[in-house]
Design a protein with these regions (language model features):
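Walker B catalytic acidic pair
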Residues: 186
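Walker B beta-strand of ABC/ABC-like P-loop ATPase nucleotide-binding domains
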Residues: 183
């Protein structure tokens, strides 16, 4: 749906309010109640025109600092919130190695460096999230059915209606406290599948300072990429 010249992806669900999101790629999404007709949706979005343009302007400003990484000696890559440099080596390694605060990659594997970095992040995230999930699921009284690390396009994580919880492999780039927030956020969706005040109250019970992590993602999320 195009409103005021902006192409907005409409997502209908069993919710009571209309929420607007600027996705990580700059596209605009609106999550709306299923019962609303198209004209009603258009009127609501038109009334939120200022908010939409304000959020788009903020996204543009934040993304001016986006980094395009090359797989060369000295290039930095994020891991758990810190940047570490890459060193290409002559010896044959199995994938990406991380040792002594340095990434190592065989020169012969440079042509598939992105693929190998993705595997590195997936493996590391898998090893990190399960103990954290175990801790917080008990505090929240929830039980996710299945945990997956995968490509999620414009989301850091997702909680499915069937109880599965998915995490983007890029979450391995975030600081550990931000990773804790992302996990708590998704587990709280097993209680409230929305972003009502009741949902945020659940998050706040576990992480009273979660606003700090939300702000970190807003400012630095653009750099969590390859």
């Amino acid at each position: 749906m195009i409103v005021s010249g902006v192409d907005i992806v409409i997502q209908k669900s069993e919710r009571k309010t209309v929420s607007i999101f600027i996705e990580r790629d700059g596209s605009v999404s609106a999550r709306v109640p299923e019962k609303l007709k198209d004209e009603e949706i258009r009127d609501i979005l038109k009334a939120k025109e200022y908010q939409i343009f304000k959020n788009l302007a903020e996204w543009t400003q934040l993304n001016e600092n986006a980094v395009e990484r090359e797989y060369v000696n000295g290039q930095s890559f994020l891991y758990l919130g810190r940047n570490y440099r890459l060193k290409l080596v002559e010896e044959k390694l199995e994938g990406v190695h991380f040792n002594r605060n340095t990434f190592f990659l065989s020169k012969t594997d440079k042509h598939k460096a992105k693929e190998l970095f993705v595997k590195f992040y997936k493996d590391k995230l898998n090893s990190k999230i399960h103990p954290i999930i175990e801790r917080y699921k008990n505090q929240l009284g929830v039980e996710p059915k299945q945990i997956k690390v995968m490509e999620l396009q414009n989301r850091w994580a997702s909680c499915m209606p069937n109880g599965n919880v998915n995490f983007h492999w890029k979450c391995a780039m975030a600081p550990i406290d931000v990773l804790h927030y992302i996990i708590v956020h998704e587990l709280a969706h097993l209680i409230h599948n929305n972003h009502t005040q009741a949902f945020w109250n659940e998050v706040d019970k576990i992480l009273p300072n979660y606003d700090e992590q939300v702000n970190w993602l807003k400012i630095n999320g653009v750099g969590m990429d390859l």
